[in-house]
Amino acid sequence: KDCDRLIAKYHDPDPFAMTRIVLAPCSPFSVTKESLAETAVFAREKKVFMHTHLAETNDEDDFCRQKLGMSPLEYMESVGWTGPDVWYAHGIWFTPEEIKRLGDMNCGVAHCPCSNLRLGSGICHVPALLEAGVRVGIAVDGSASNDSSNLLKEMQTALLVHRVGTGVSSMPPRKVIRMATRGGADILGQPEIGQIQPGMAADLALFRLDRIDFAGAMADPAHAVLFCGSAPRAEYTIVAGRVLVEKGELTGLDEREVFHRANDLAAGLLRRAGK
C-alpha cells in the first residue's frame, strides 16, 4: 500500500522529470519469494522500474545454491525480476552463461568498483558484460560500504581494475565515461539525459584541468581527468539547468555546518555503541 501511495504521489514518468519511484528491496534475500514475485507484477502494472543488489559475494552465491538449489540470477528469473526494467547492483558472481543471458534479457548492472574492492567482494566482469550487450552504468553503492561516494573515483578505479588480465585496450577512458553517463541513462530508461547535445537535459559536470596535477596531459582532457589527479571535485555541477556546485562548493547549504553535524552524529552513535 505504501508503494502505491508513493507512486501515486511522487512518480513522474515524463521526460526531464526529477522524481521517479523505483521498487527496490535491498537484496532478494531480505524479503520472501512471494513478496518479490508480487513486487514484479505490481511494478509492471504501475510502469515503474525495479532494482536490487545481486551476485555481490561468493557467500551469497553459495547460500542461494544451498538453500534454493539455484543461482541468484536463476532465482530472479523465477520471480519475474529480469528484463529491461530491472537492474542489479554489483553483479560480480555471474557465470559466463549467465552473462550471456543477462544480455539476451536486456537487464542492467550498476557497477560499484570501489565498494566491491573495499569489501573484498570481487571484481565484476565488466568487459564481458559489455561484450554480451548488458547495459552497464557506474555507481557508488552506499555510505555503509563506500566512504567517499565519489563518482569520478569510481571511474578512475574502473578504468584501471578492468585492464588487469584483459589488456589496456579493453577499458579505454571514453568507454568508462560512456558507462558513467549514457550507460546510467540507458539503465534508468531516460534517453533525455547522459549526453551533451541539443534537446537533452542541461546536466553538466565541469572540472578544472589547469592545475599541476594535469601538467603535460592536455593532449586529451578525457584521458587526463581519469589518469591524472586524485578524483578532483567538480568545479561546477549543473542538473537540469540548476547550478548545484559552484566554484567547488555546494550551493544551498553550509558545508561546514553539515561537516560538524555529521561528526556529532557519528560520535553519538559510537558512544551509544560503547566504543
Give residue ranges: language-model regions.
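His/Asp/Glu-enriched, well-ordered alpha-helical/loop segment
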Residues: 78-85, 127-211
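Conserved, mostly hydrophobic/aromatic
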Residues: 23, 53, 76, 88, ...
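Histidine/acidic-residue-rich catalytic or RNA/ligand-binding cores of hydrolases
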Residues: 58-70, 98-103, 120-129, 146-161, ...
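Metal-coordinating catalytic core of metallo-dependent amide/deamination hydrolases
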Residues: 1-91, 97
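Alpha-helical segments flanking ligand/cofactor-binding loops in enzyme cores
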Residues: 37, 41, 74, 99-100, ...
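Glycine-enriched alpha-helix->loop->beta-strand junction motifs that scaffold or abut catalytic
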Residues: 40-49, 81-84, 101-110, 131-136, ...
